[in-house]
UniProtKB/Swiss-Prot annotation:
Belongs to the MIP/aquaporin (TC 1.A.8) family. This is Aquaporin-11. Aquaporins contain two tandem repeats each containing three membrane-spanning domains and a pore-forming loop with the signature motif Asn-Pro-Ala (NPA). The keyword Glycoprotein applies. It comes from Milnesium tardigradum. It catalyses: H2O(in) = H2O(out). The keyword tRNA-binding does not apply. GO terms for cellular component: cytoplasm; membrane. A motif (NPA 2) lies at residues 207-209. The chain crosses the membrane at residues 5-25, 59-79, 120-140, 153-173, 184-204, 220-240. Glycans are attached at residue 148.
Length: 270
């Protein structure tokens, strides 16, 4: 029994950290909603909070992966992705999504730039935020992460191949988001699947905000390579999805409508 408890202890601490992050971010949202009246200011604050929550929880998922492996990482990512869908409010936490909404005239240029800027700012401080909990030293791995200031790049292939992966992942993500039956469960499952598709190639981020927190400045990845793969890739993917989403989804979802019409026709004939 003692051995089992000690085996699960790090997982319980990591879960506690993730819940701590979510709770602090939710508290900040509540305070912002009560005190901040200016719409653009609230948008900026929400993007900042979303970025901190997204990136800080992913840092803790790295702890879980190191101790329990990638199966535990998948479960943790599913849980975190599920929480993002009902805590992010109107936040995008993704500059490439802001770009896409601007192109679709769903967002002004001013708002898109504001959201992207504060999202990146949130990503920039998220590591320091995660280190606050790690500094408590509740387990040895937390202390290792707290003391370690360096990281190795996730990109395991040539830059152009990494660019292709990040672009393709973004296209798939956008297509799913535009489907009629898209919901929180599909969002969480697709996040896990798309991430694992590129996890051992480029890291599977398909989000400039998250990749900025996790990859920028890591050993083995130059600045130009980072921006080409992890920023231009998602923006290119968003641009392509703008062109192909409607006709492709019309074919995919239109087939369901055709089946319904066939069933109705058979019912009437009977």
């Amino acid at each position: 029994m003692y051995t089992q408890i000690m085996t699960m202890y790090p997982l319980l601490i990591s879960i506690l950290h993730i819940l701590f992050i979510i709770s602090i971010c939710q508290l900040c949202r509540y305070v912002s909603n009560v005190l901040v009246k200016h719409s653009l200011a609230r948008i900026a604050i929400e993007e900042f909070i979303c970025a901190v929550q997204l990136c800080a929880t992913n840092f803790e998922l790295g702890v879980i992966t190191q101790i329990y492996g990638f199966s535990a990482y998948a479960l943790g990512l599913f849980f975190c992705s599920f929480t993002y869908t009902f805590t992010f409010q109107d936040g995008t936490c993704d500059p490439s999504e802001c770009y896409e909404k601007f192109c679709k005239r769903e967002m002004s240029a001013r708002e898109a730039v504001l959201r992207a800027t504060f999202s990146i700012m949130g990503a920039a401080v998220s590591y320091r935020f995660a280190k606050i909990f790690w500094s408590f030293g509740l387990m040895a791995t937390h202390m290792d992460f707290y003391k370690n200031e360096s990281c190795d790049a996730s990109l395991q292939v040539p830059v152009l191949i990494g660019l292709g992966f990040e672009t393709f992942e973004t296209i798939v993500n956008r297509l799913l988001q535009n489907m009629r039956h898209y919901n929180m469960l599909i969002s969480a499952i697709s996040d896990v699947c798309i991430t694992f598709f590129g996890l051992f190639v480029s890291g599977g981020y398909f989000n400039p905000t998250l990749s900025f927190a996790m990859e920028y400045g890591c050993q083995g990845l130059s600045g130009p390579s980072f921006f080409l793969v992890y920023w231009f890739g998602p923006i290119l993917g968003s641009s392509i999805s703008l062109k192909i989403a409607k006709p492709l989804l019309r074919i995919i979802e239109g087939s369901d409508e055709a089946k319904v019409e066939v069933v109705d026709a058979k019912a009437h004939s009977d």
